[in-house]
């Protein structure tokens, strides 16, 4: 599983700015008002051969007993307990504050490594600016600037030092490894029990990690599956005696480790921002996806229409996924759900031959040629498969850097229809390996003496005829 870095610190020390720097995005809301990051935000990053997850917490205000700031602090404490490494951020310009001391006291009791990052240190002497932060007792402070990127590479390298480089992804078709994800109380626990059944549970902690994610082997209809259970710890013989809890870190890790993700939604609740964030993260990781709308029973026809409209409006970017309307409690719709899981798994690991891909590409171009972009019209010539889980299709041709996004979506749709790639994201990559100017980037060779003489002679003639160079 990918290591998880958790950013903690009091409000307004620059956690969201560092998050954006580490993930190359601007997903976290950045504002100068304390408390603007209300929920934990999460993303992926990479340094060298090491990918990682980043969780940006709300500001930790230990003195607040209730209200939204107390809820932010509670979520932060949960993230601290589950992190692989913690980056504790302080403000170089504000110095050590009483809140910093309280947070440091809490962090000294955790088992995960803690790195002390002194942010907003741009233009300042590093030795001087970090000196007073030694009193926090968290090791050597590291001066950084999230806004300017100073010291960020060293910070991340130190945080990831204990973790190995990413292993090459397997292309094996294997058994569907399913992660059920979703907000609390949408029915994940009930769905786990409905799918597995008490008599078939084989639960064990994943080796090599400190997580309490549970892997459950089960069979259904004679077919084997592996379920990654994020709904709560399940011990042998106590499958039904659990309280569902939501853990962002375990959920993100499960998505990374799965090859099919089932996003569970509550039909009686509107689609939330958290639902959309989870769906977007699944899309970003490239995992096959099936959506299960639970608690469908008991809704009127009018209510069902409202739910479908809400889904169509807020999850339109999941047009590749299949949607299942189920009742986990009454075990309705589960067979179709498993069929769609199988289909999504097969699509994610499909083998696509170069001749067939090229034939589909040629037919798509013949029906609708790429529009010109500037002086040249892009000319896709052939395609081959560049990866699985998700499938990657690499296009070759001339002037392909001019392919517009809408035309790439058209090609993606053509490939999906031809190969029935339902349930998995599809990546289109461009390889500009033909039709380039062979002299691009090369300097003109200096003129020989005779060439220079002829050039001067031509210039003299032009002056006599035209009166200028």
UniProtKB/Swiss-Prot annotation:
**Ligand binding (GTP 2):** 182-189, 229-233, 294-297
Renumbered to this chain, the signal peptide range is none
The UniProt keywords, alphabetically, are:
GTP-binding, Nucleotide-binding, Repeat, Ribosome biogenesis
Q: Which InterPro entries match?
A: AAA+_ATPase, G_ENGA, GTP-bd, GTPase_Der, KH_dom-like, KH_dom-like_a/b, P-loop_NTPase, Small_GTP-bd
- Calcium as a keyword? no
Q: Where is the EngA-type G domain?
A: 3-167, 176-349
Basic residues bias locations: 455-469
A molecular function GO annotation: ribosome binding
Ranges of compositional bias, category Basic and acidic residues:
432-443
Record bears the keyword Lyase: no
Q: Which GO terms describe its biological process?
A: ribosome biogenesis
Q: Which family does it belong to?
A: Belongs to the TRAFAC class TrmE-Era-EngA-EngB-Septin-like GTPase superfamily. EngA (Der) GTPase family.
Protein role: GTPase that plays an essential role in the late steps of ribosome biogenesis.
Protein name (Swiss-Prot/TrEMBL):
GTPase Der
